Amino acid sequence: MTDKIVTAEEMRHYDFYTINTIGIPSLVLMERAALAVRDEILHAFPIALKDVVVVAGSGNNGGDGIAIARLLHIAGVHVTILNIGNPQHASAEHQTQEKIAQYYQIPETSDLAVLNKATLIVDAMFGIGIDRAVKGAYADAINAINNTDAVVVAVDMPSGVNTDTGEVMGTAVRATTTVTFAYNKVGLTKNDGKDYAGNVVVANDMGTYAVD
């Protein structure tokens, strides 16, 4: 266990070193991240698993979300993927996870109405990547999430919260729990970020290595 708290740039540096110098593939890190979130959901929120919706952006945080959806599906949970953003801009890892999800025939939609019946929502839109005000479909999705009574589990960071400052970038997901990877993030400990994050769980057994 470590009390280390990092910025977005530090975390990107550690990920880059792990992937490109040590040689651990990014998909391996993504799978470990997904397993950590799955375990937290299954162990902490078993009563909220009737209808789970994973809200996935087009980047690697969304790829984490799709992997989480697959793992929950395999565990017998009824899960739907709500895709937000442009799939043509999806990262390579995201595209790989999408192909696997299609193999398992996990339901997917772009209709925000699916959130209305959700008992648990996984927020996998931005992660540590947000650096500007949230607008458009992402803002609509965040506001729709916040208008539900569902348990909300954020992946790495609540979408819309700045990783370095804890500032809300226009609008942000109000999470019940945030599962953050490898190290705690500065933005989860200060300003609005500490309130929007809910209970913070640091999944530190990620295989990501710090090099300072």
Swiss-Prot record:
Binds 1 potassium ion per subunit. The keyword Zinc-finger does not apply. This is NAD(P)H-hydrate epimerase. The lineage of its organism: Bacteria, Bacillati, Bacillota, Bacilli, Lactobacillales. It comes from Limosilactobacillus reuteri (strain DSM 20016) (Lactobacillus reuteri). PROSITE patterns: YJEF_N. It catalyses: (6R)-NADHX = (6S)-NADHX; (6R)-NADPHX = (6S)-NADPHX. (6S)-NADPHX binds at residues 60-64, 127-133, 138, 156. Residues 11-212 form the YjeF N-terminal domain. Catalyzes the epimerization of the S- and R-forms of NAD(P)HX, a damaged form of NAD(P)H that is a result of enzymatic or heat-dependent hydration. This is a prerequisite for the S-specific NAD(P)H-hydrate dehydratase to allow the repair of both epimers of NAD(P)HX. K(+) binds at residues 61, 123, 159. Its EC number is 5.1.99.6. Its cofactor is K(+). It comes from the Bacteria. It is an enzyme of class 5 (isomerase).
